[in-house]
Amino acid sequence: MGLLSKKTKQVEIENFPPIGGIMVSKMIIEEHKKPMFMYRNKRDNVNDSGWRIFSGFESDEYTEDPNNAGIYAPSTILEIDPSIAELLLQGGFGSVFERKSYQSPWYRVTDFPLEDDYMVRHRLTDRWELDINNLFERKIEEDGDLLYTTGDKSLRIAIWNCENKTKAEIYAEKKQTVANRDESRAKTLKVFDFSDEKIARIGYMIKESDERREYNVIFGSSIIDNQEIFIAFYFDDDENLTWAIETWKGIKLIG
């Protein structure tokens, strides 16, 4: 586990984003205990945030009884403990946090088992497949791109046909683009080349930001003759660089 440390703006409870309902132990709601442990499952529906919050005093028997928890709006739990506001926004599906006392900081937990946390294989086309964690939600966007996201990590995929161009030709064009990109808005932090005999892979990493936070972005290409898969990875934590690289390599040819 590691100490949670983020550079984000203070969240206003009265203007808290509509993330969906939160399942909260009644020890918190009715017995007025503070949250001490929380995790985020893959949500059941669009009205479910996926968050499950506990006081840390619940027994297994208590937790297994559905009558001992309820679904509440974020504002209800934030009135009890506003310290979790940033966690509710920062933590994607699969996130787990705990703290040792009411006064101590929250820590990210990395060894708590979640039922939806396992790898799956998705077929992208008749030639490509992807290995990715089941915690990611998948949807097709209006422009036809394929989006996978947990909330704090995202992967966007576009498949481009490049008729009458060899893998070497497409790769050379992409390499030139990376080398000559305009860095006035975002500096190139890393350049990647994971090419092998079957697939050419090239890309780069930058940082972008919105009104709340700064995050990492990797733009990459996986290339074969006549076709390119363009991939954009978005992730908040630097430690998720390994996730992005391994997921990129997990986009592979079938067979």
Q: Residue spans of the language-model regions?
A:
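Short, hydrophobic/aromatic-rich segments at coil-to-beta transitions
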Residues: 21, 35, 116-121, 144-145, ...
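Short, surface-exposed coil-to-beta transition loops
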Residues: 48, 141-144, 211-219, 243-246
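Amphipathic, interaction-prone secondary-structure segments
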Residues: 21-47, 51, 134-137, 144-145
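Secretory pathway targeting signatures of secreted, lumenal, and periplasmic proteins
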Residues: 45, 126-173
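Signature of long, low-cysteine stretches enriched in small and polar/charged residues
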Residues: 177-225
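Surface-exposed amphipathic alpha-helical segments
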Residues: 134-136, 229-255
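Acidic, aromatic-enriched beta-alpha/helix-loop junctions
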Residues: 38-88, 162-187
